[in-house]
Amino acid sequence: MADIKNYTLNFGPQHPAAHGVLRLVLELDGEVIQRADPHIGLLHRATEKLAEQKTWIQSVPYMDRLDYVSMMVNEHAYVMAIERLLGLEVPVRAQYIRVMFDEITRLLNHLMWIGSHALDVGAMAVFLYAFREREDMFDMYEAVSGARMHAAYYRPGGVYRDLPDTMPQYRASKVHNERAIKAMNEARSGSLLDFIEDFTNRFPKYVDEYETLLTDNRIWKQRLVDIGVVSPERALQMGFTGPMLRGSGIAWDLRKKQPYEVYDKLDFDVPVGVGGDCYARYLVRVEEMRQSNRIIKQCVDWLRRNPGPVITENHKVAPPSRVDMKSNMEELIHHFKLFTEGIHVPEGEAYAAVEHPKGEFGIYAISDGANKPYRLKIRAPGFAHLAALDEMAKGHMIADAVTIIGTQDIVFGEIDR
């Protein structure tokens, strides 16, 4: 009698559920996965090496392109590492703006995740709903930075500029008539803070809509419950962070455990899952959206009442105002040297980590006193999660591999770097 032999299947990299360029080599016994071997590197762009050739500030746009659905949070870790090397004090208003945009970015990420995860599993409506809300948040990005995705808004010592008093307006087109445009621009008639406040008042209702579609849906539960179970002990051993760790029942969140910026002054809860399966991680992320909305509301309230500077007064790090530059020779020299040479960061090393939507995103920067990093190491949260795919998928069906990839919320910009 011939030996029963497992067969091998290539999953991706051209696959709609591969979330970019994931190639999985699956060893199957019938339709049951015996081994899953992730092949990475197809989106490798040598970001760490590129940063060594650029001045400290020129690498800020590279950060946006790591996890390209959580743009500003990537920038935050990078500028925090520079600030620690420089010993810079960031103005409190800039800290609140950063925290507010970190949480807006968390919503952007989680909406992309819930839409694509549901689409992978077979529910299409949520994907369309999620993009409706993302559109408003892209408008917030555009208002402060001029870009809808890759903002490059954070700077060492603060942010690029203060919050604007006007919002970008829609114009009539072939797609929308004037009546529709008027309705769309109604919430955009005031300042950015007015628009964000209006959005935070509407957003809880949208999260309820997603939950109505998914949470008690029996097909959704059949596809997620008891799939990709990870115990708390294994989650710690494998280096899980973020919703992947909290879904296994461990209440670890850098915003609470190692507070940075003004998170210690804000009131929010850390959602923790029970069971460590895909469904628990789904519930954690849905509740995280509600908590992020709470944080944004508190930031809006504080920012309305407290005007002030949004970037450091140290002109060796941040450019002087254009008015000063054109009337003061010393400020002109600062401006010229800053944009030709860049910042000279003192010798030393620093690690800065933020609670990224996907987990702990860290930047380890080493300076030799020059105007560019000697070495930059990026700690991508998705890397540890993807390494656990073999263990999470073993014994499950091929269709469940799609669910497990979705629950990990993988983006290859940060994994391949």
UniProtKB/Swiss-Prot annotation:
It is an enzyme of class 7 (translocase). Keywords: Cell inner membrane, Cell membrane, Membrane, NAD, Quinone, Translocase, Transport, Ubiquinone. NDH-1 shuttles electrons from NADH, via FMN and iron-sulfur (Fe-S) centers, to quinones in the respiratory chain. The immediate electron acceptor for the enzyme in this species is believed to be ubiquinone. Couples the redox reaction to proton translocation (for every two electrons transferred, four hydrogen ions are translocated across the cytoplasmic membrane), and thus conserves the redox energy in a proton gradient. The lineage of its organism: Bacteria, Pseudomonadati, Pseudomonadota, Betaproteobacteria, Burkholderiales. PANTHER family: NADH DEHYDROGENASE [UBIQUINONE] IRON-SULFUR PROTEIN 2, MITOCHONDRIAL, NADH-UBIQUINONE OXIDOREDUCTASE 49 KDA SUBUNIT. Signal peptide: none annotated. It comes from Cupriavidus taiwanensis (strain DSM 17343 / BCRC 17206 / CCUG 44338 / CIP 107171 / LMG 19424 / R1). This is NADH-quinone oxidoreductase subunit D. It is found in: Cell inner membrane. NDH-1 is composed of 14 different subunits. Subunits NuoB, C, D, E, F, and G constitute the peripheral sector of the complex.
